[in-house]
Amino acid sequence: MKFIPHDYQRYCTEYIKTHPVAALFLDMGLGKTVITLTAIQDLMLDTFEVNKVLIIAPLRVARDTWPAEIEKWDHLKNLDISIVVGDVKTRIAAVHHPAMIYVVNRENVKWLVEYYEKNGMRWDFSMVVIDELSSFKNYQSQRFKYLRKVRPFVKRWVGLTGTPSSNGLMDLWAEIGILDGGERLGKFIGRYREAYFKASSMNPANGIVFQYKPKEGAEELIYQRISDITISMKALDYLHMPDCNPTRYEVEMNTEERKLYDMLKQDLLIPLKDGDIDAANAASLTGKLLQMSNGAVNDENGKARVLHDHKLEALEDLIEAANGQSVLVAYWFKHDRQRIINHLTKLKIPVRDIKTSEDIKDWNAGNIPVALIHPASAGHGLNIQQGGHILIWFGLTWSLELYQQTNARLWRQGQTQVVTIHHIITKDTVDEDVMAALEQKDMTQEKLISAVRARLEEK
């Protein structure tokens, strides 16, 4: 297929080529993969500035999306790629297979660095691309530590993500630091924290800080510090996107159900005959309350105890209202998945997970009336927008990143219909807190994106 780039795609490609360190905060659906591959091709085969490239990506994206993009576009036909995924034997063979581009899943970064070290091999990647930069926001993770070890040997770094700082500005220290070696935000997280943040939640007994917030003026200063290597574009700025209609479908507990919910909330315990429901701490309590909001909660023996079916009934109503159109249902807890399957099966409504390539193909062909998806597996590279335009959140997630990525499976470039995103919310429960938290995180994220947004008309 012939690639005819949009202006913003051409601009982003040139940005990568002219910036040894580049962080591209591009919204879902803007074509990060083809943009990056086009830049790689030019750097390797035109200017000869790069001779070997490592791409780090989520497993499915590493295995399927990057090789598929090379195969898809005519102008990339001269690139060859080796996929370093699978068992150890397969990975070793892929490492030694002659290629221009090597793609490894992020879970195997530590293994790859160690393999080079143990075998006395020189780290000879002149360019590293991190597809989903937010995967490296945890500076204590093994993947972060091992990639940082080889950073001095790499002359070009590219970070790709659509959701920078989804949980606040603190994450940026690791994300930007892995690219620029700490040049802009400092080499130590403690100094970064001291310079730009102050405690917002602290245990007065021992002085342990639970949460930080930016100091006055710190946000603008952080944005300014990273602006010379960062480009950001929102999909709505550069694409004709279909309308997106978010809705809330509220359900309500009855008096007895509310009593049990409040008991757990206040006492951290619901005593039951054959297995208590308890919460060890505030974090555990939040999870248990989310489960109760959805209708079932795990007891101390790991058994799901059903509290109510209000969300299942709401789901049934929404599927009926879809009038035969395919519906994508997002769930969070494993036992909710089984409850949904059992409920819809009784109603003789076909339901199926989207996991394999065959599932994706059948969904896009309109052959799956109701598809189930977990937000953690609904990430980048999953193209299912052709199969439907209705998403129902049965159970919510705290993660803005996973929430947005799941929504973007349907609301993205290539979608031809108005997208409707239903949120089934149990009134006066932690469900409402989660929605509020997602909205609050989005405010922080939008500030970041706005602060570093590229304006093509000014270039």
PLM features per residue range, with description:
Residues 52, 78, 127, 144-237, ...:
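Conserved P-loop NTPase motor "coupling/switch" region that bridges the ATPase
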